[in-house]
Amino acid sequence: MATENPNIVFIFPDQLRPDFLSCYGAEFIDTPNIDWIANNGVKYSRAYSAAPICVPARTSLLTGMNAIRNGVTDNQHFLRSDYRQIGIETLPEVL
């Protein structure tokens, strides 16, 4: 029997705060598609970031490693091209 992969959607917008989404109470904007995902999936009331800036935070989320360990400590660096060879796995690869 084949194993079915989970349906996981990560939305990685830059600088999007919950007060800019109608599913979190914003009244000046309608975000029906994100609202649908929030109402039919998982919606968080608290979030913590592994890094204070974008690229390291996203890389930490995808690798499960902090910025020092995965080597992405600022917005000018990205995950090494040989990350697989040095033993780093990303969430999509694990799933």
Q: Where would I find each of the regions flagged by the language model?
A:
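Formylglycine-dependent sulfatase
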Residues: 1-95
